[in-house]
Structures are given as C-alpha cells and as structure tokens.
Amino acid sequence: MAKFVFVTGGVVSSIGKGIVAASLGRLLKSKGYSVSILKLDPYLNVDPGTMSPFQHGEVFVTEDGAETDLDLGHYERFTDTAMSRLNSVTTGSIYQAVINKERRGDYDGRTVQVIPHITREIRERIKRVANNSGADVVISEIGGTVGDIESLPFLEAIREFKGDVKRNDVVYVHVTLLPYIGTSGEIKTKPTQHSVKELRSIGIQPDILVCRSDRPINDGLKNKIGGFCGVNSDAVIASLDADSIYSVPLALKDEGLCKEVLDCLDLNDHESDLKDWERLVHKLRNPGPSVKVALVGKYVQLNDAYLSVVEALRHACISHDASLDLHWINAENIESEGAEKLLQGMDAIVVPGGFGNRGVNGKIAAIRWAREQRVPFLGLCLGMQCAVIEWARNIAGLEDASSAELNPNSKHPVIHLLPEQQDVVDLGGTMRLGVYPCRLQANTTGQSLYNEEVVYERHRHRYEFNNSYRTLLMESGYVISGTSPDGRLVELIELKNHPFFIACQYHPEFLSRPGKPHPLFGGLIQAAQMRVPSSPSEAFNPQSKIIEKKSLEQQ
C-alpha cells in the first residue's frame, strides 16, 4: 500500500512548495522508492488551459493530454517519471465532478455539501493516483497559502485523510519563510509560528518544517522553532536560497529531509544513489563558454510562461558544457525596432509557441533573420507555423501567405485549422493534446538527431500545415522531415544548406530532462557553439554522439 506525503505552504505564496515536492521525489527515488506527485490547485478553473500565460505561466501538457500547472513539469524533470491527468486537480474539476454526480442522482437525494462531498472527492482523487501509478509514495502539493479561504476544502480533505490510513502512512510537510530583518540583524521566526498555528487550527500538526531563508539557520534557531511549533528540532529543515533549482535536492538531502520523511512513514532508509545528480550540478556550476540564445516570444514579461523551454535549453547546455546566456526578446519590439538591432550577435534563436496575432510579424522577422544570417534556429508549435509562413512569403512567392488563425481572409492560408477542429466551439481541453507519433524521413537532420524512425511527442495546437501547399513549398526547397505515420500531418520541417534550421509542430521541451536533454535542443546548442570562438565543440554533425539521447551515466 502506498504512503502519502502532503506538502503545504505558509506565510507567502510562491515559497517553493513545488520544488520541495519535486526534490523530495528525487531523493525518494534515489533510495529505490517509486514516486508519483500531484498538484491540488485551489482555483475554480477546471484546468489552466484557457488561462492567460501572464496569469498562470506555462501550461504543461502530460502524455495523456491534460493541460496542467507548470509544477508538473518540475515533478517530471526531477523524478524522470511521466505524470498523467490524474496528477492535476483543481477546485473547478472537483466541483464539476461532484455536480455531475448530483445531476445523475448518485447522492440519492441528499444535500450536497463541501463536507463531506467535496472533501471526499478530493481524497478519492489522491487515492486514485496511488492506485493508478502503483507508486510506493504519493506526494501531494497543496496550492496556495495556509489561511487562504480557497485552500480550506483541500486542507480539510488532507486532515480527514489521516483517518483513512494508518498513522505511519501519512506525513505532513509544511514549507514556511524565515524573513531576515536587516535593521535588527535577526532572522524572525514569528511568521512561521503563526503559520503553524493557523495549520493547527484546521486540525493539522505538521511533522516536518521546511524553512526557507536567505542565510544559514543555526541549531539554536531550529530548537526555538521546533519548541514553539511542536516539531522535533531534527525535523526543522533549512532550505537556503540556491544557485539553481537543481541544487535543492542535494541541499535538502544534507539537511536530512528524506531521512525524516522515511522515519515518519516507517520506511527503510536505503543507501541513496545521487551520483548522476551530483555530476549534473557540478557541470552546471562549472560550465564552458557561454552561448547567446535569443528567445523571441510574446509573453516574455513573465519568464514562467516559457519555463520548460528555458529548462530544455539549460539541459542541453549542461550536456554540452556550455553556459546559457539567455536573451528575452519581445516579438513586438522586433516589429518596431527591427530584427538586426535586437538579434545581432546571437548564437541561436528560439521561437516558442503561443496563440493569437500579437507579435507574430516580429516572430516571422526573427525567423527570416535566422534563415538569411545562417543563425541556428529552433521553432516550436507556433514557431513552426511562423517559419512556414516566412518561407511561403519570401521564398515560395506567396506574398499573402498567412495562417487561418491570424488572417481568415488570406488568399494563401498555408496554416489552417485541423479538420477535426472545424466544429469545435469550447476552448478548454479541445485542442490536439497529448502524445502522438511522428515518422521521421531518412537522411534528414531531424532523423539523425533522434536516431529513431518513429518518435512520440506532446502536442497542444488547433492549426496545422496546409497540405494544399506541400508540393509548392517542397519544390522551392523546404524539407518536410517528419509527419504523422499516415503522412497526413506535417510535424517537423528543416532547411538544407543551413547550420541548423529546424521547426516542429509539437512541444519537445516537455520531454527534456536534466540528464537527458531533448535531441532538438541538443542539436541547437551544439550548432550555436560553433559560433563561439572559444567553444571546444567540433563542427556540427547531426550524427555526432554528443547529441544522441543519452543519460549522464553514459557520459
């Protein structure tokens, strides 16, 4: 039977619960335990799929097509374990399920209430993850902050949960903040005490406290916190600000977080195997020459909107002994200031996904610059669609070429709506979502990078390459290097006689891992290194073993 860990947060939002949960998952896995992690989000949206990137940040897509919180990306990257739609729970999805049951008459005419019906549904979702995944340990991160009214049903549900299992089958971890007051030169514990008091008022006594701080916490302070909060001082874990999120698992290991969790759950504390992770962090802290990568997007004001893209670039740089020098470029600024001014000197250009008209012409201008100046380029989702439009306009002679999404009146809609999307009205959860196969063409850069005939990638889009223009674009020099197995959908395009020019309709960033960078990102960084004078990289060769998919153990 599975064991359960609940991670809550206090004092402030964005305190790092997701990284703590992901780090704990990594530590447990290093000791031989299988792990699944779920996020319980207290907003009324059924999922974040229709939320603005400025509001929510990135929407992470799972293999089975769920649109989820970006924390699931952290969970997958840290544990190298695929999550599913069951691992993402929102207040909206809970209420939707309960109301649907009420409409079907499942409650036999009873009055439907937050307690017990909503809280029972939450508990059932957590147990469903345990049953579906078969994990030894299920970690649940409760979104929001203790004291928020939105989080109360979830906190009540996890309080009730301890009545469903044996005492040593559940542990409560509370992440809190220890602020430093510069004028007095002191770390203050009072906010943590009040946060724990608030949690206790709900009926939850935390077993472990993870205390965020920007400076070391001495034993005297740990004893004080433990005494006031009813926690053993050994279970007061310091979590100092780190140079990288990938350093956090090692820091929490040294603080004894995993040992305390295993003790509470009555699990054996096996010898841990973190050599690969330690090697990863060492390479991250000791990089080679930097590569300048321009990320040309429309949501660059909030970096979290492209979180997985940035992490995929970072993974590739770690693998290739490079330092990532990332330049955030607003696509709209390219429209007003020009590509040359903003992109001159870049070693690589990435144009990620997005929706709507705003900034598209700037993205197209950036792609033209990359093509004409022979700068390594990678386009993702909308980035591929913009690359097709750029080629159609400037090489294939279709001056009016556009996407049906961007210009419904275009005479040459080289990108059009997927046939199965024609009659779709609702926005939420109705796109082409999740994993689909892609057959790669032999003797192409794409096939050489993957070193596979068929690959499986995650999608999130409604629009697709218009096959009416396939012959024209191919005759003008475009290379279609990947399609759906039936050949109907164009998934991957590239250019010959260019250092590196590849664009895909899918989202490869969702499959990149710290120890296993995605081949497309690996190829981009290796090509970018060729533009760095002091780079040790050899001439770019897509068949090079450097860019094959491999783990750090093989390096």
Curated annotation (Swiss-Prot):
One GO biological process term: pyrimidine nucleobase biosynthetic process
UniProt protein name: CTP synthase
Substrates-to-products reaction catalysed: UTP + L-glutamine + ATP + H2O = CTP + L-glutamate + ADP + phosphate + 2 H(+); L-glutamine + H2O = L-glutamate + NH4(+); UTP + NH4(+) + ATP = CTP + ADP + phosphate + 2 H(+)
Sites where the protein binds Mg(2+): D71, E141
NCBIfam families linked to this entry: PRK05380.1 (NF003792), PyrG (TIGR00337)
Region (Amidoligase domain): 1-267
Binding positions for CTP per the UniProt entry: S13, D148, I149, E150, K188, T189, K190, P191, T192, Q193, K224
